[in-house]
């Protein structure tokens, strides 16, 4: 489970991230990111916060919950590498229902990398 300080809970936070943030689409998900320091809020401190949107288009409840659990597990590993004060909303597309956890993680990391929220992985030995 994602710790409470790293969860997006309020509808207004989701809306601000989706409407005012940057967006990067991948095959099975769309990543929205918003830097809280840009907002007129005093709540720009704290670690990154993650929110999930898994609609009925993904599939029945069992499948939607499975996709959400996979994405939450991936987000736990990203808490330490995404910059503090960043809100991230991950919107699952219908293809996420059949994608493996590894594919979802690769797509999420690629989206965050394109949004300049992750440092590129060095391939030097």
From Swiss-Prot:
Query: PROSITE patterns annotated for this entry?
Result: RIBONUCLEASE_P
Pfam families, alphabetized: Ribonuclease_P
Q: Which UniProt keywords apply?
A: Endonuclease, Hydrolase, Nuclease, RNA-binding, tRNA processing
Q: Which domain of life is it from?
A: Bacteria
Q: Which residues form a coiled coil?
A: none
* UniProt key word Protein biosynthesis: no
Q: What would you give as a GO molecular function for this chain, any one?
A: 3'-tRNA processing endoribonuclease activity
Q: Name one GO cellular component term.
A: ribonuclease P complex
What start and end residues bound the annotated signal peptide?
Answer: none
Q: Which EC numbers characterise this protein's activity in its record? A: 3.1.26.5
TM region(s), chain numbering? none
List the InterPro entries: Ribosomal_Su5_D2-typ_SF, Ribsml_uS5_D2-typ_fold_subgr, RNase_P, RNase_P_CS
Share an example GO biological-process annotation for this protein. Answer: tRNA 5'-leader removal
Catalytic reactions of this protein: Endonucleolytic cleavage of RNA, removing 5'-extranucleotides from tRNA precursor
Question: What family is reported?
Answer: Belongs to the RnpA family.
PANTHER family hit by this protein: RIBONUCLEASE P PROTEIN COMPONENT
Q: NCBIfam families annotated for this entry?
A: rnpA
What binding partners and quaternary form does the record give? Consists of a catalytic RNA component (M1 or rnpB) and a protein subunit.
Q: What does this protein do?
A: RNaseP catalyzes the removal of the 5'-leader sequence from pre-tRNA to produce the mature 5'-terminus. It can also cleave other RNA substrates such as 4.5S RNA. The protein component plays an auxiliary but essential role in vivo by binding to the 5'-leader sequence and broadening the substrate specificity of the ribozyme.
- Protein name (Swiss-Prot/TrEMBL): Ribonuclease P protein component
List the source organism.
Answer: Rhodococcus jostii (strain RHA1)
Species lineage: Bacteria, Bacillati, Actinomycetota, Actinomycetes, Mycobacteriales
């Amino acid at each position: 489970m994602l710790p409470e300080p790293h969860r997006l809970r309020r509808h207004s936070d989701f809306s601000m991230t989706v409407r005012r943030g940057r967006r990067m689409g991948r095959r099975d998900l769309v990543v929205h990111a918003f830097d809280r320091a840009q907002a007129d809020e005093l709540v720009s401190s704290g670690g990154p916060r993650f929110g999930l949107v898994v609609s009925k288009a993904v599939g029945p409840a069992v499948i939607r919950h499975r996709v959400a659990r996979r994405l939450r597990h991936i987000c736990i590993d990203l808490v330490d590498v995404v910059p503090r004060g960043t809100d991230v909303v991950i919107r699952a597309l219908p293809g996420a229902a059949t994608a493996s956890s590894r594919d979802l993680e690769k797509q999420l990391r690629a989206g965050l990398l394109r949004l300049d929220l992750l440092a590129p992985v060095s391939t030097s030995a």
